[in-house]
Amino acid sequence: MYELKKLNLKQSEKYMTYKCNEYGKHYKKFSRIIPVVVIITLVAAFLVPAQAKVIYALGVAITAGLFFMVYSYYKQMVSLKEVPSIPCEYVVTPVKYNERVQLKTTKGEDLLFAFVEKSRSIYKNEKEALIIYVPESGHVYGEHVALLKDIKG
């Protein structure tokens, strides 16, 4: 029987970063392109002084578009990292494929039996970990636990 362990902030941030990985990739990519666009704009305006105004206008437009994209991805990442509707976040580790797990709250109360359908490595170079959300009622619902199939036990 596994006991639920409360996640510390560092683990929680790592997991949420994993969860919104796609937004993070785009955010990093576009935020790194902005200085490159600024440098290219300045170099191009220096090399072709006759077209400097047009080059500056294009550079400003592209940079503004990139800033808007970076801001929108950042906003989406922050919205994913906000506190979930389920008040408690716990981790069960290690978890193996097809392992039947009985969950126990930190207060010692037994929860439903759960069967691990899939197992994924959330943290690189660490053991398998399963993140679950447990509401105050103590019931684990499938919509909150993507990797668990509830078994009434």
What do the PLM-derived regions correspond to, one by one?
Residues V101-T105:
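SH3/SH3-like beta-barrel fold
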Residues Y123-G153:
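A membrane-cytosol interface segment of integral membrane proteins
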Residues N98-R100, E128:
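Exposed beta-strand and adjacent loop surfaces of beta-rich binding modules
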Residues P94, T106-K107:
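N-terminal compositionally biased, intrinsically disordered segments and leader/signal-like regions
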Residues M1-K28:
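Cytosolic juxtamembrane N-terminal segments of multi-pass membrane proteins
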Residues L80-N98:
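Structural detector for short beta-strands of small beta-barrel domains
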Residues K19-E82:
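Alpha-helical transmembrane spans
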Residues E109-I122:
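Beta-strand/loop nucleic-acid-binding surfaces
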